[in-house]
Amino acid sequence: MPTVASPLPLTTVGSENSSSIYDYDYLDDMTILVCRKDEVLSFGRVFLPVVYSLIFVLGLAGNLLLLVVLLHSAPRRRTMELYLLNLAVSNLLFVVTMPFWAISVAWHWVFGSFLCKVISTLYSINFYCGIFFITCMSLDKYLEIVHAQPLHRPKAQFRNLLLIVMVWITSLAISVPEMVFVQIHQTLDGVWHCYADFGGHATIWKLYLRFQLNLLGFLLPLLAMIFFYSRIGCVLVRLRPPGQGRALRMAAALVIVFFMLWFPYNLTLFLHSLLDLHVFGNCEISHRLDYTLQVTESLAFSHCCFTPVLYAFCSHRFRRYLKAFLSVMLRWHQAPGTPSSNHSESSRVTAQEDVVSMNDLGERQSEDSLNKGEMGNT
């Protein structure tokens, strides 16, 4: 099974081969015999497939719409659009793995060894990519607003493209354990499961991967977002540009939503690590953490459904893209043979109008920052 945070196919209680962080057993045989998790397993077989299916449907619809609208209606690839495109692709690849895990949890792994590795690796890469691209978007706004860096220059565009490539490469490197250790395993009753088998080093690997997720997947991105948006807020308060209040509310909302979606899950993982280290715990605590992990994991996975709303649909400019796209589709549906070049051209012109929003506030705010900076130097 995937080793990062992916849904664990519900194995028999006390399976010592399972090295996913979503384990239902303790590390020593004596405790395994005492702490039965049959109720937890039964709950997961019903709850998780339903949640994974909802995430698949909502995430697929939202991110596919985001991707199509950006590709069709965006007049030129601004920096934010590039990040949104990559975020949409990452989210789509992430939600594509959900049906596989839903079937695996409800029944068992039926897709063979090759897909076991592919789906696990695909899950892990895009799990981190989604978080990293959100962080990059906050960095992009920070550079554009606080440091008034014009992002349309070739040097800035090259830097952003390099950063996008680095995000994919870094996520791929983090997912190496999925490629190496994940494989299918057959239980005594002939049921197949897909998970990582670290052999005698399972405990060390599980703890390492959990702490890695806590650090790279939550703590560092959260601190970066707090720093970037705090500095953005200070600049907006000082310069008082048009749309300041809405921009500040959006900045605060982005940080709060990220925290609310990811903190419960990462806290539960951290407590599970302490449980495995025997810092505290008994069977009752183990049961509660198992239930909590299933719920908080589902909440965290829903990030791929919320990000299109937060980072795109709250933008006036994107809503204009969407309106132009829907107008073209409606016109094509009503009269498939009617030329729509004039309409498309006018839609693109309309989409290029300058509007203040969280996703494009930098373009207006950086100009105000530069103008006021020049006035201060005179």
UniProtKB/Swiss-Prot annotation:
Membrane topology label: Multi-pass membrane protein
Tissue specificity field: Expressed on apoptotic neutrophils (at protein level).
Subcellular location: Early endosome; Recycling endosome; Cell membrane
PROSITE patterns (UniProt xref): G_PROTEIN_RECEP_F1_2 (PS50262)
Posttranslational modification: Phosphorylated on serine residues in the C-terminal cytoplasmic tail.
Keywords for the protein's UniProt record, in alphabetical order: Cell membrane, Disulfide bond, Endosome, G-protein coupled receptor, Glycoprotein, Inflammatory response, Membrane, Phosphoprotein, Receptor, Transducer, Transmembrane, Transmembrane helix
InterPro entries listed in its UniProt record: CCR1-9-like, Chemokine_rcpt, CXCR4/ACKR2, GPCR_Rhodpsn, GPCR_Rhodpsn_7TM
Family annotation (PANTHER family): ATYPICAL CHEMOKINE RECEPTOR 2, CELL ADHESION MOLECULE
Record's protein name: Atypical chemokine receptor 2
Source species of the chain: Mus musculus
